[in-house]
Amino acid sequence: MIKKAIAKVVERIDLTEAEMIEVMDQIMSGEATPAQIASFITALRMKGETVEEITGAARVMRDRATPIRVGKGVLDIDRDDINIDQETILDVVGTGGDGTNTFNISTTVSFVVASCGVKVAKHGNRAVSSACGSADVLESLGVSLDVTPETVENAIARIGIGFLFAPALHGAMKHAIGPRKEIGIRTIFNILGPLTNPAGADCQVLGVYREDLVEPLAHVLHKLGCKRGFVVFGMDGMDEITLTRETRVAEVTREGVTVRTITPEEFGFASCPPGDLRGGDAAGNARIVRSILDGATGPRRDVVLLNAAYALVAAGKATDPAEGIRLAAEAIDSGRALAKLEELIALTNE
């Protein structure tokens, strides 16, 4: 199938979701050769990946990931009705590769949101283009990455947050590592990670590194069954909601996708220069994360509050971002967010 797929994509013919599933199965099973993998993902990038192609690839990666099982069906009470449903699991994650070298915003947000009572399955990896990815900063903070899937499940169940280290849970990706490194360009694999949470997170805030990915990835999340989510791109290039400029936000609900542009000012925050959000290496970013969770004020806290607000809306803990900002501020100022970090450090080092 992959030979036929390469021939089609070279002619700029889109693949169906079913065709993409077949190709990805060949790639992730080791059936496709390195040359075929490199040719395919390069041609696909030149053509431009469609919603159907990304969705098909994400389905295969999800199916082949080591599963993190969380929740066995709980009484879910929201403002409209009462029903028995799987426990809500949230992921706050970016594609990385935005080149802005900010501190680890989504990682900081994860502890704030978890301390508000949301189950967080934080999916992440080491640095892509910055000096410090989520795995790097967590390791520097004292969180052990060398844990079993059962430990991650236990962390989410017991304390409400666990870190899903992508290389440990996506073993089938090994077949694509060589071709990806050798061609050295961004491909579909750069956007698949945030779509393939092994815990099956059904609520999400997903940051992307290009504006033209916002709406397509929102439609992918919708097709993959996301209950509520936001795909965001800061117009300064950040794969987060930014304070320096406007942010494009695509909201995903059961009904579909809506897109709008937001500004920090509409939520009561002052805009700031990019340097105010910049980070450094793992040790430096760990100090920044801890200082924010310990109550430090300024633009870094503000950007965490705004991103946490949207995460709380996605998880159903806040009706709107304004309520989310208030809840996030309370979580930090009460000490609960910092305590959540300490709990994860302790649990992963037991």
From Swiss-Prot:
Disulfide partners: none
GO terms of molecular function: anthranilate phosphoribosyltransferase activity; magnesium ion binding
Binding site for Mg(2+) 2: 239-240
An example Gene Ontology CC term for this record: cytosol
Entries under Pfam families matching the protein: Glycos_trans_3N, Glycos_transf_3
Cofactor(s) this protein cannot do without: Mg(2+)
Binding site for anthranilate 1: 94, 125
Sequence positions that bind anthranilate 2: 180
Catalysed reactions listed for this entry: N-(5-phospho-beta-D-ribosyl)anthranilate + diphosphate = 5-phospho-alpha-D-ribose 1-diphosphate + anthranilate
Domain of life assignment: Bacteria
Subunit structure, interactors included: Homodimer.
Family listed: Belongs to the anthranilate phosphoribosyltransferase family.
Protein name, UniProt field: Anthranilate phosphoribosyltransferase
Species this protein is from: Geobacter metallireducens (strain ATCC 53774 / DSM 7210 / GS-15)
